[in-house]
Curated annotation (Swiss-Prot):
Involved in chemotaxis. Part of a chemotaxis signal transduction system that modulates chemotaxis in response to various stimuli. Catalyzes the demethylation of specific methylglutamate residues introduced into the chemoreceptors (methyl-accepting chemotaxis proteins or MCP) by CheR. Also mediates the irreversible deamidation of specific glutamine residues to glutamic acid. The gene is cheB. Belongs to the CheB family. The keyword NADP does not apply. Keywords: Chemotaxis, Cytoplasm, Hydrolase, Phosphoprotein. The modification 4-aspartylphosphate is found at residue 57. The active site is at residues 162, 188, 284. It is found in: Cytoplasm. Contains a C-terminal catalytic domain, and an N-terminal region which modulates catalytic activity. Phosphorylated by CheA. Phosphorylation of the N-terminal regulatory domain activates the methylesterase activity. This is Protein-glutamate methylesterase/protein-glutamine glutaminase. GO terms for biological process: chemotaxis. HAMAP family: CheB_chemtxs. The lineage of its organism: Bacteria, Pseudomonadati, Pseudomonadota, Alphaproteobacteria, Hyphomicrobiales. InterPro entries: CheB-like, CheB_C, CheY-like_superfamily, Sig_transdc_resp-reg_Me-estase, Sig_transdc_resp-reg_receiver.
Length: 347
């Protein structure tokens, strides 16, 4: 048995520190080795204890979590899991943290929540195991091809991601031109975060990016992000495809689920689709991507070296669902190659 993941808990609330510590300590594969109430205490604790993982509150006195995270990533890079309030302001700050290099995020529990921090221990263990080199600077993103260079065909694109997906999706979608193929995305994320993430992507990318709504038509130049929460994103509609938000139990522990999206794309579009599975814990999306490939779609997976967590892409690759494994920096361009109109017509 490998050594437990060693964690430093940083939060200005003694109650929250106690709750996080209790949740993590209930897992024998996690060891809380220290606590800190602000960034100054945390800095000294990191030097003294050398933790494998830090859980970091965003809103703290003396120095907020974002400023402290930047210092960690610059001076002593390590896996950091952000702990945030489930508000619009908290979502904006968390998304900024994920772009800076935080491993993942969890929301602070609301009143009466049945399982507070239910997946935190699993995220901590994944963070401790990650092979990602946190000291590596983010690769520069090439400008998207111009409209004149890209003629869109008839295919739709479906993308699934989880842990590490914020950075990965930005890297992929910033390669898309304004006239990109219709694209649907399921990213595992808390309900209040997806709207803020869609707005952030819309500011960063050439196409229009929006949170998916029930009945929204799939259109060229638009990207639809599954809203977090109570429903799954599917596509349907035959010759006039549209988004559908459906009430179903969680699949693979997730709602929305990547498998649900990929299954619907396989049924609707068959060979006129491209499926992409990016970094993430677990196996959600692997079976659905295999279904897409069996239906004739082209399928891509992110390489282990460029994943924050090589979980979902690994399972998909082992199942035979992935036609090509590519580094993150190459995926956006490959999607455009696979969805471009042929010279003699459109596909």
């Amino acid at each position: 048995m490998s050594a437990p993941a060693r964690v430093l808990v940083v939060d200005d609330s003694p109650t929250m520190r106690g709750l996080i510590t209790a949740v993590l300590s209930s897992d024998p594969e996690v060891s809380v080795i220290g606590q800190a109430g602000d960034a100054l205490e945390a800095r000294e604790a990191i030097k003294r204890l050398n933790p494998d993982v830090v859980t970091l509150d965003i809103e703290m006195p003396n120095m907020n979590g974002l400023d402290f995270l930047e210092k960690i990533m610059t001076l002593r890079p390590m896996p950091v899991i952000m702990v945030s309030t489930m508000t619009h302001r908290g979502a904006e700050a968390t998304l900024a943290a994920l772009e800076i290099g935080a491993f993942d995020c969890v929301g602070k529990p609301g009143p009466g929540e049945h399982r507070p921090f239910g997946d935190l221990a699993e995220k901590v263990k994944a963070a401790a195991r990650t092979q990602r080199q946190f000291s590596q600077p983010a690769a520069a993103v090439a400008p998207p091809p111009s409209v004149a260079d890209f003629r869109v065909g008839r295919k739709i694109v479906a993308i699934g991601s989880s842990t590490g997906g914020v950075e990965a999706l930005i890297a992929v979608l910033q390669k898309f031109p304004a006239n990109c193929p219709p694209t649907v995305i399921t990213q595992h994320m808390p309900p209040t975060f997806t709207k803020s993430f869609a707005e952030r992507l819309n500011r960063l990318c050439a196409p229009v990016v929006q949170e998916a709504t029930d009945g929204a038509r799939l259109e060229i130049g638009k990207i639809y992000l599954a809203p977090g929460g109570e429903r799954h994103l599917q596509v349907s509609g035959g010759s006039a495809p549209c988004c559908r938000l459906v009430d179903r139990a969680p699949v693979n522990g997730h709602r929305p689920s990547v498998d649900v999206l990929f299954d619907s794309v396989a049924e609707l579009a068959g060979r006129n689709a491209v499926g992409v599975i990016l970094t993430g814990m677990g196996r959600d999306g692997a079976a659905g991507l295999l279904k897409m490939r069996h239906a004739g779609a082209r399928t891509l997976g992110q390489t282990e070296k460029t994943c924050v967590v090589y979980g979902m892409p690994r399972v998909a690759h082992e199942l035979g669902a992935v036609e090509q494994q590519l580094p993150l920096t190459a995926i956006g361009e490959e999607i455009l190659k696979l969805t471009a109109a042929r010279k003699e017509g459109t596909e």
